[in-house]
Amino acid sequence: MSIFKNLYNYRELLKTNVKKDIRGRYKGSFLGILWSFLNPLLQVVVYWIVFPYLFGRGVTGENYLIYLITGIIPWTFFMTSVNMGTSSIKANGGIIKKVYFPREIIPLSQVLSGIVNFLISCLIIIIFCIGTGTGLSYHVIAVFPILIVQSLLTLGIVFILSAIDVYVQDI
């Protein structure tokens, strides 16, 4: 329980770290935060073209695009959070050696910035559902419990891999 108390006591540092991660991800980029929309959108377009047309396989039909978007956006959240979070302890080694704070803040901030990115990307799902006439159903309320479970799973994996990454270089 002391970990939760420490995180609560250092919540401002956590919030600042999340903001820094989000700004740093798009700093120097011409499109900035628009990449939160474009990255999953471009992935969807590639999968939409590659699988049914080039390979002649995959799920087809009128909801194929929605099918792709609802799978790629959560996967992108998971993949990005694990990739960034795994190397986060080693990347912030200098500050860890100089200042005391709960070390869990560093990987946690990576996952939280991934959640913010995910929620921004969810606007794409909403736009496509409304734009294609599929509409939104009552299943939308399941997004938040699923997001909590996926975030906790991602956080657990990130904690384990970031600890291993300090000692093993190739993770």
Model-flagged regions — what are they?
Residues 1-171:
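Hydrophobic transmembrane alpha-helices and immediately adjacent juxtamembrane helices
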